[in-house]
């Protein structure tokens, strides 16, 4: 009886696809089944802000059974969610929800954060080392199909092991490799896990 508006922050469902242009690719958009089920099973929630799936909701979903408003931004800070609620007698009588595009290259850096980033860049510089090579074009990831970066990783595995076939999971590719000089930092951004490469012999049948 002391709450005027109940807002729930959720983090469930399938993780967002590891693909740089995922928000522009309907093929990899994650379903909201778990969020919808939760909002239908728990009455009294005015606003549910979802996460984890990175499924941007441009217009709020109104749950048909409970009236809960459901929204979510895309991932990686590409949008800023803005919610305006008009409340009368503890009821949301109007709402306006927007996903605002964030153009990070147009924003000045925060001085304190920039200083800390610069400090840690100096700390890890010896581990990064000099450039290892160059990319003549950006090597991108795709989540549901073959990609240039995925092909490169698989080719490295084959070269290292002498295997006939190599397989890597798309979810383990966490960043594209940019055009230009590539150092160990770029490699760790793209493939940050301490995975073991394992060779097995399989029957052809």
What spans do the regions from the language model cover?
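Loop/turn elements at helix/coil->beta-strand transitions in domains of secreted/extracellular proteins
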Residues: 2-6, 43-46, 66-68, 162-164
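Active-site neighborhood of phospho(di)ester-bond hydrolases with catalytic His/Asp-centered motifs
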Residues: 6-11, 45-56, 71-73
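Phosphate/diphosphate-binding loops
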Residues: 65, 70-72, 76-79, 85
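Short acidic, glycine-rich surface-loop motifs adjacent to enzyme active sites
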Residues: 1-23
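Surface-exposed loop and adjacent secondary-structure segments within mature catalytic domains
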Residues: 1, 75, 99-102
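Solvent-exposed loop/linker segments at secondary-structure transitions
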Residues: 15-18, 30, 37-41, 47, ...
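Residue-level detector of flexible, active-site-proximal loop/helix-junction positions
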Residues: 55, 77, 174
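Second-shell residues forming the walls of enzyme active-site clefts
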Residues: 23-27, 56-57, 69
């Amino acid at each position: 009886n002391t709450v005027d508006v109940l807002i729930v922050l959720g983090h469930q469902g399938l993780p967002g696809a590891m693909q740089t242009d995922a928000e522009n690719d309907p093929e990899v958009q994650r379903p909201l089944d778990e969020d919808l089920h939760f909002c239908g099973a728990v009455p009294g929630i005015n606003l549910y802000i979802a996460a984890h799936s990175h499924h941007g909701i441009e217009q709020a979903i109104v749950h048909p059974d409970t009236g809960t408003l459901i929204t979510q931004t895309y991932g990686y800070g590409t949008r800023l969610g803005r919610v305006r609620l008009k409340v009368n007698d503890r009821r949301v009588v109007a709402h306006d929800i927007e996903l605002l595009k964030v153009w990070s290259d147009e924003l000045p850096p925060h001085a304190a954060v920039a200083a800390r980033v610069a400090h840690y860049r100096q700390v890890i510089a010896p581990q990064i080392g000099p450039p290892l090579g160059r990319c003549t074009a950006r090597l991108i990831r795709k989540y549901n199909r073959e990609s240039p970066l995925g092909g490169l990783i698989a080719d490295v595995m084959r070269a290292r092991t002498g295997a006939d076939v190599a397989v890597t999971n798309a979810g383990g590719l966490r960043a594209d490799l940019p055009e230009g000089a590539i150092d160990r930092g770029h490699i760790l951004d793209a493939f940050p896990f301490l995975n073991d490469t394992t060779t097995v012999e399989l029957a052809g049948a």
